[in-house]
């Protein structure tokens, strides 16, 4: 199975009727070549607060997962050029030694009033048994599971 970036996978899921927030994906190379154009597209597509998320080529794979490893920037004014520009740079710099021009940035509407959020894996990370594990929280903070700042629940 060939894994795609987080952004591309979410776009595919949206096509198949999953409820995915409005999304926009672009490569680091596209942003470096014309940041003004990319930010203009973001400002046209999004009118509310956004989240700038990582979508690295090696974030999800058969052998390794970097879920929660890279930065996200939450609660940004989509119409602020400098806020969006700085957030993209922060996420890009979190790629560090995993840097590639093919790495992407994922922009989404910022979710509010979240009832439950979490991460699903296809193996138990403690003993690598091959079954689905869902780590989740019922808190409104969507960063609880990936940040590790509090214990989440497992299913």
Region locations from a protein language model:
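Nucleotide/phosphate-binding sheet-loop regions of phosphoryl- and nucleotidyl-transfer enzymes
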Residues: 1-155
């Amino acid at each position: 199975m060939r894994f795609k970036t987080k952004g591309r996978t979410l776009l595919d899921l949206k096509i198949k009727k999953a409820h995915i927030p409005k999304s926009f994906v672009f490569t680091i190379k596209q942003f470096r070549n014309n940041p003004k154009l990319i930010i203009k597209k973001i400002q046209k597509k999004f009118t509310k607060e956004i989240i700038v998320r990582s979508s690295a080529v090696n974030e999800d794979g058969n052998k390794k997962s970097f879920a929660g490893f890279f930065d996200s920037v939450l609660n940004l004014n989509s119409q602020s050029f400098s806020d969006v520009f700085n957030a993209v740079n922060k996420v890009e710099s979190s790629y560090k030694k995993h840097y590639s021009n093919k790495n992407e940035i994922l922009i989404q509407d910022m979710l509010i009033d979240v009832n439950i959020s979490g991460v699903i894996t296809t193996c138990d990370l403690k003993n690598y048994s091959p079954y689905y594990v869902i780590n989740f929280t019922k808190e409104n903070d969507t960063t609880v599971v990936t940040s590790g700042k509090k214990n989440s629940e497992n299913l």
